[in-house]
Curated annotation (Swiss-Prot):
GO process terms (BP): lipid A biosynthetic process
UniProt cross-references to PROSITE patterns, sorted A to Z: HEXAPEP_TRANSFERASES (PS00101)
A GO cellular-component term linked to this record: cytoplasm
Record protein name field: Acyl-[acyl-carrier-protein]--UDP-N-acetylglucosamine O-acyltransferase
Species lineage: Bacteria, Pseudomonadati, Chlamydiota, Chlamydiia, Chlamydiales
Enzyme Commission no: 2.3.1.129
Gene3D superfamilies from the UniProt entry: Hexapeptide repeat proteins (2.160.10.10), Udp N-acetylglucosamine O-acyltransferase, C-terminal domain (1.20.1180.10)
Task of the protein: Involved in the biosynthesis of lipid A, a phosphorylated glycolipid that anchors the lipopolysaccharide to the outer membrane of the cell.
Quaternary context: Homotrimer.
Residue ranges of coiled coil: none
UniProt keyword annotations, A-Z: Acyltransferase, Cytoplasm, Lipid A biosynthesis, Lipid biosynthesis, Lipid metabolism, Repeat, Transferase
PANTHER family (alphabetical): ACYL-[ACYL-CARRIER-PROTEIN]--UDP-N-ACETYLGLUCOSAMINE O-ACYLTRANSFERASE, ACYL-[ACYL-CARRIER-PROTEIN]--UDP-N-ACETYLGLUCOSAMINE O-ACYLTRANSFERASE, MITOCHONDRIAL-RELATED
Length: 280
């Protein structure tokens, strides 16, 4: 049964699903769609042509679908789409998009922690975690299963590849290749996100191929393009390696981050139980 508190403001025209809870003093504007089992906590504000997927919770004082912070916006009809079973925590802000018909999208099973900001025209994949105060500028693309630490700033038009992990307080100015881990301002790649991939049950053989790919691309004397070609020749049967190469070859407004933390070790075992080491 849907439960809307008497002090909540739900405008005529808002589409409310089954078993939705809207707590005291929350505001839901007329063009919003709340799917089944959504919870809108006290003082949350949801505006614009916003759709919130099943089972998602919007926590107190979060703001979703408000006017983009972009001087180019002239009142066009734009959208926000949030997937299923997400947690949009306190004071997070997800603005609407800029340019007619465009969408800010967030996938399923995402955790957006307090004070995070997702700007106009951003795209966020599934199973993503943004820690507190993560700040995405406009047009940023974030892949699936990405974790971004607290107080990270991301430049507009940057792409962050799937299964990557960005350390806290980093400044991201260029595209982050998938499956990598890094930190710093300026940002430096530290290697492959070995622990994260293991937790996602990526196979030992795939992790080993990705570590060798990273070393070939970022720590060899080959040119960037030549190293991408050579890893395809050696490890092209691994889908994750192909995805890594395709990401690096895609057109980019910011370019691929190539700064590497030379002190980061790539010689540790990627699975202690299996006892495998990677040659230095």
């Amino acid at each position: 049964m849907t439960n809307i508190h008497p002090t909540a403001i739900v405008e005529d025209g808002a589409r409310i699903g089954n078993n939705v809870t809207i707590e005291p003093y929350a505001i839901v504007k007329k063009s919003v769609t709340l799917c089944d089992d959504v919870v809108v906590k006290s003082y949350a504000y949801i505006d614009g042509f916003t759709t919130i997927g099943r089972g998602t919770t919007v926590w107190p004082s979060a703001m979703i679908g408000n006017k983009p912070q972009d001087l180019k916006f002239k009142g066009e009809k734009t959208f926000v789409e949030i997937g299923e079973h997400c947690e949009i925590r306190e004071f997070a802000m997800i603005t609407s998009s800029t340019f007619e018909g465009t969408t800010v999208s967030i996938g399923n099973n995402c955790l957006i922690m307090p004070w995070a900001h997702i700007a106009h025209n951003c795209s966020v994949g599934n199973n993503v975690v943004f820690s507190t105060h993560v700040q995405l500028a406009g047009h940023v693309q974030v892949g699936d299963c990405v974790t971004i630490g607290s107080m990270v700033g991301v430049h507009q038009f940057v792409r962050i590849g799937s299964y990557s992990m960005v350390g806290a307080m980093s400044g991201i100015r260029r595209d982050i290749p998938p499956f990598t881990i890094g930190t710093g301002n300026p940002y430096a790649l530290g290697g492959i996100n070995k622990v994260g991939l293991q937790r996602r049950q990526v196979s030992f053989e795939t992790r080993l191929a990705l570590i060798k790919t990273f070393k070939r691309v970022f720590r060899s004397d080959e040119s960037f393009q030549a190293s991408l070609e050579s890893v395809l020749e050696d490890f092209g049967e691994v889908p994750e390696v192909r995805h890594f190469v395709e990401f690096c070859r895609q057109p980019s407004k910011r370019g691929i981050e190539r700064g590497v933390d030379c002190e980061a070790s790539l010689e540790e075992p990627i699975d202690k139980k299996e006892g495998a080491f990677v040659e230095s």
